[in-house]
């Protein structure tokens, strides 16, 4: 299936290169659109799925029966786009406008190094993991800027909460990925997936030897995206909407889009780092040469990656529907007193497992 896609993309790439410098620019613009458009479409359907899943959990009639809930998310988009963007008179006008863009840009830029299959990646960077750490850390600057530029005590309090929370859990996420780097011997995302390949199927994935780091990265990813039960940044019962309290219309929609794009991104990264990315859970168990439309079931391919992503993306919604919000001090305590010490200990354990051959790098 991967070869079929490449047969379509390669001739198109060569045609653009044949146009000279202008073709190179057009190809770069096309690659940007290849990131932005699918992410925006994925966010739209993710919102529909969130409404339907929570509707099933809460037995709500709207998302379950009225048009199957499909039109509610799109109605929200049109409502926000046609609303007026009102700026507070005491706000910093330029920074107020820049803040949502500064939040959205890193959320989209991070996708450029995410591999969907062995050869299906926009930029196969050798430092892809470090690039991702940098991009996922930049989004908080837009939140801080929004809180400061709004000149509102609620917005500023939400921004300060976000800064402390992201810094705390960014350290835990970084340490968790150090374990992945030690186990794989690479910071290239495709090579990290290949390091989990073998003839034992899912037993070769990093999920088993790095299970504590998997849990830390997963929970930290939820906290990093400010989602329930770590959504104190925009705690409705305390600070109304946090850093977004003064935003409306399209500007508010940009924050919304960045949040959901980051949720999908974290779901992809968990699948790549710990669940073998596009690898099949029965890799090496079946050897049969049949149609490329079927052999991905045991040889691996992007459908496996999408199924893993779907599970983690749905887990985000499940967390929101099931767990109450943590207090701010509980979130800080969990990050600094539990996750960071645990990751430091397991980095040492991972190094020993690699040294003694317990973790074997794949093909």
From Swiss-Prot:
Compartments, as annotated in UniProt: Cell inner membrane
UniProt cross-references to PROSITE patterns, sorted A to Z: COMPLEX1_ND1_2 (PS00668)
The Gene Ontology CC terms held by the record are: plasma membrane
- UniProt catalytic activity: a quinone + NADH + 5 H(+)(in) = a quinol + NAD(+) + 4 H(+)(out)
User: Which segments cross the bilayer?
Assistant: 29-49, 62-82, 96-116, 127-147, 163-183, 202-222, 238-257, 264-286, 299-319, 339-359
Q: Its topology with respect to the membrane?
A: Multi-pass membrane protein
Which GO BP annotation is one of this protein's?
aerobic respiration
**NCBIfam families recorded:** PRK06076.1-2 (NF004741), PRK06076.1-3 (NF004742)
Q: How does it assemble?
A: NDH-1 is composed of 14 different subunits. Subunits NuoA, H, J, K, L, M, N constitute the membrane sector of the complex.
- Report the function annotation for this chain: NDH-1 shuttles electrons from NADH, via FMN and iron-sulfur (Fe-S) centers, to quinones in the respiratory chain. The immediate electron acceptor for the enzyme in this species is believed to be ubiquinone. Couples the redox reaction to proton translocation (for every two electrons transferred, four hydrogen ions are translocated across the cytoplasmic membrane), and thus conserves the redox energy in a proton gradient. This subunit may bind ubiquinone.
- This protein is called NADH-quinone oxidoreductase subunit H
- Please report the organism this UniProt entry assigns to the protein: Xanthomonas euvesicatoria pv. vesicatoria (strain 85-10)
């Amino acid at each position: 299936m991967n070869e079929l896609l490449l047969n379509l993309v390669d001739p198109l790439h060569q045609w653009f290169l044949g146009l000279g410098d202008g073709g190179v620019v057009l190809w770069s613009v096309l690659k940007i659109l290849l990131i932005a458009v699918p992410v925006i479409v994925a966010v739209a359907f993710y919102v529909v799925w969130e409404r339907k899943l929570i509707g099933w959990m809460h037995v709500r009639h709207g998302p379950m029966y009225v048009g199957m809930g499909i039109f509610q998310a799109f109605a929200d988009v049109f409502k926000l786009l046609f609303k007026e963007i009102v700026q507070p008179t005491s706000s910093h006008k330029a920074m107020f406008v820049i803040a949502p863009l500064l939040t959205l840009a890193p959320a989209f830029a991070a996708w450029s190094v995410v591999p969907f299959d062995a050869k299906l990646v926009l930029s196969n960077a050798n430092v892809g993991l470090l690039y991702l750490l940098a991009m996922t850390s930049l989004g908080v600057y837009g939140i801080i800027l929004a809180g400061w530029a709004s000149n509102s005590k609620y917005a500023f309090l939400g921004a300060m909460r976000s800064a402390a929370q992201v810094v705390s859990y960014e350290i835990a996420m970084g340490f968790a990925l150090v374990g992945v780097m030690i186990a794989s011997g690479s910071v290239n995302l495709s090579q990290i997936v290949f390091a989990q390949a073998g003839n034992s199927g899912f037993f070769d994935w990093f999920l088993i030897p790095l299970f504590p780091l998997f849990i830390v990265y997963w929970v930290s990813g939820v906290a990093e995206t400010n989602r329930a039960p770590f959504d104190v940044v925009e705690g409705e019962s305390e600070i109304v909407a946090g850093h977004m309290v003064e935003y409306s219309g399209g500007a508010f929609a940009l924050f919304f889009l960045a949040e959901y794009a980051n949720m999908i991104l974290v779901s992809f990264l968990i699948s790549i780092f710990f669940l073998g990315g596009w690898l099949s859970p029965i890799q090496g168990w079946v050897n049969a040469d049949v149609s490329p439309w079927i052999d991905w079931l045991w040889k691996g391919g992007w459908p496996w990656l999408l199924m893993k992503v779907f599970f983690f993306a749905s887990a985000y919604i499940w967390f929101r529907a099931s767990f109450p919000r943590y207090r701010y001090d509980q979130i800080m305590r969990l990050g600094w007193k539990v996750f960071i010490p645990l990751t430091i200990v397991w980095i040492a354990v991972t190094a020993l497992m690699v040294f003694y051959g317990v973790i074997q790098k794949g093909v």
